[in-house]
Amino acid sequence: MNVKTTYRRVFLIVMDSVGIGEAPDAEKYNDKGADTLGHIAEYRGGLYMPNMAKLGLSHIREIKGVPKVERPLAYYTKMKEASAGKDTMTGHWELMGLRIDKPFRVFPNGFPDELIAELERRTGRNVIGNKPASGTAIIEELGEEHMKTGAIIVYTSADSVLQIAAHEQVVPLDELYRICEIARELTRDEPYMVGRVIARPFIGKPGHFERTANRHDYALKPFGKTVMNELKDAGYEVIAIGKIADIYDNEGVTQSLRTTSNMDGMDKLVDTLGMDFTGLSFVNLVDFDAKYGHRRDPKGYGDALEEFDARLADVLPRLKEDDLLIITADHGNDPVHHGTDHTREYVPLLVYSPRFRGGKPLPVRETFADVGATIADNFQVNRPPYGTSFLADLA
């Protein structure tokens, strides 16, 4: 690892679902007109995001309330998703150099009877639910029945996901996790090919149920080497914050830091800014998506964006001359769009280091994989087959 890197530490923030306007192929995904950031800003009469403004957010495209500064600090552009799909795993895998041409399977009418029957047989518990639903809504609807009968609540969403909810006093966590491992085994390959199985434990009484932080994701393993694998294999640190380790099924991770919220994620990111390491610190801020996007809550989403922006004041001054900060997203989830699903959008890209003498526009990126290619280029590890590094464009 005696390699001279341009930047010793790279900090990558994925603002989960913070899209910046419809992608060219949005119509194919029934997402014409989707615009996560733009619509939230309009709904609120403007967003107060002075730190993102300084970096150059409104230079990518104007966001109401976020002024265009004369000299943005960051290099800025937007990125197009090359893969088929608009889910978390597809977006994150592409960021690290994989392209998914065959989208993970989705189950808009619930899972096939034969899969549910096999899950019941293998776990010894009946299944209730088996439909697309909001996680909070389905535990309100079926939580009481679950507590009386011990049947597990299975549900899905517009994503490729099989979620299993259970009360922690009815189905102990170790049993719930074991059930999810069985579900993962059953849906790993065709004909089901589910991207993620998620344990969704909750507590409380009927009418006052609350999901706990003991969620656990069981993702498919990435089907090729990611940039994270290359970094780890070369002896660099890869610190995964939030659900990053779950998304990549722990592939290429040297240290995993769990989080309970966006703000906890920012706390953990700030902690890593104080650590002495060479490599990547990679955080996913899931609340934008899980708490506000899917629930179509533009007010809450806007509040969360402003809270995130305020926390950048803890991040920017701690960056050293040989640090690089990359802020982006994995897909859109426009809270004023129809339905409750993700939206096919461009995502913002802001790239900053204290050594920059001001930012400039970068060309629009044709794939999220340009981020992974740039990180690989910086640490001089094998680059992924997809993606073009923009490292040389950062003066």
Swiss-Prot record:
Reactions catalysed according to its record: 2-deoxy-alpha-D-ribose 1-phosphate = 2-deoxy-D-ribose 5-phosphate; alpha-D-ribose 1-phosphate = D-ribose 5-phosphate
GO cellular component annotations of the record: cytosol
Enzyme superclass (EC): isomerase
Primary subcellular site in the record, as a coarse category: cytoplasm
InterPro entries to which the protein is assigned, alphabetical: Alkaline_phosphatase_core_sf (IPR017850), DeoB (IPR010045), Metalloenzyme (IPR006124), Phosphopentomutase_DeoB_cap_sf (IPR024052)
Keywords noted in UniProt: Cytoplasm, Isomerase, Manganese, Metal-binding
Residues annotated as binding Mn(2+) 1: 16, 330-331
Disulphides: none
GO molecular function terms listed in the Swiss-Prot or TrEMBL record: magnesium ion binding; manganese ion binding; phosphopentomutase activity
Enzyme Commission designation: 5.4.2.7
Similarity remark: Belongs to the phosphopentomutase family.
HAMAP family: Phosphopentomut
Function field: Isomerase that catalyzes the conversion of deoxy-ribose 1-phosphate (dRib-1-P) and ribose 1-phosphate (Rib-1-P) to deoxy-ribose 5-phosphate (dRib-5-P) and ribose 5-phosphate (Rib-5-P), respectively.
Name assigned to this protein: Phosphopentomutase
Provenance organism: Geobacillus kaustophilus (strain HTA426)
Organism phylogeny: Bacteria, Bacillati, Bacillota, Bacilli, Bacillales
Gene: deoB
